[in-house]
Amino acid sequence: MSANKKTLVLKVGGALMQCEMGLARLMASAANIIKSGQSVILVHGGGCLVDEQLKANGMETVKLDGLRVTPEEQVPIVVGALAGTSNKILQASAIKAGITSVGMSLCDGAIVNGSIKDEQLGFVGEVSPNDPTYLNFLLAQGWMPIVSSIAVDDAGNLLNVNADQAATVIAKLVEGQLVLLSDVSGVLDGKGQLIKTLDKAHADELTKLGVIEKGMKVKVEAALEVAQWMGQPVQVASWRDAEQLSALEKGESIGTQVMPH
């Protein structure tokens, strides 16, 4: 892979996995980007699938400030849905698009350090960058890592990590270009219009007004953190417009550009 092109770190959500056409488009774009000489890492959640599995097992989905509460009895279901089914759905789609991929989680290769985020959230983790060696090895082979947001702490507890937060840590690890993809075109204002550029002051104002809330609040906070840490913009965009990803190679913005402050 070209040394002068930053690795593209794409975060995708669970809704994408329920849209076969959207998934195929995303993988076709990823394949083209890899062929052009740029490495790609896919980091994923799988909230919709987790919700379905919990419901099928007679369990409730509870969220606190946009983060999923994960009590101990739900851990096997969450891990199975994310590190298992969701990861393999994405890998199958990658193979179909001609991409050589490696399905993995945050536990692999000591890439991150994991710990319990907040006792109120149960087995929800927060992670920090540790060692990029394993990821760099995979990228050097021209392979695309597909990373589920399941981590392990030093005590051996399986932890559910918010996928936006997981993607920020992966982007830091490889010093990559982060794009957070969701099912909306970017960050929207109170009238539902796309905000082209967003800085911390504007984000804080919209959060106070309740315009940015729940899952988007977590996403914007993650984007601001990486933008500031790396001194470069982070994109929040829609996976429905996956063809636009090639525009990033030319330095063009897609969706909302979250700026360092």
UniProtKB/Swiss-Prot annotation:
Broad class of the protein's primary localization: cytoplasm
One CC-aspect GO term: cytoplasm
GO biological process, one term: arginine biosynthetic process via ornithine
UniProt keyword annotations, A-Z: Amino-acid biosynthesis, Arginine biosynthesis, ATP-binding, Cytoplasm, Kinase, Nucleotide-binding, Transferase
GO molecular function: acetylglutamate kinase activity; ATP binding
EC number: 2.7.2.8
Protein name per its UniProtKB record: Acetylglutamate kinase
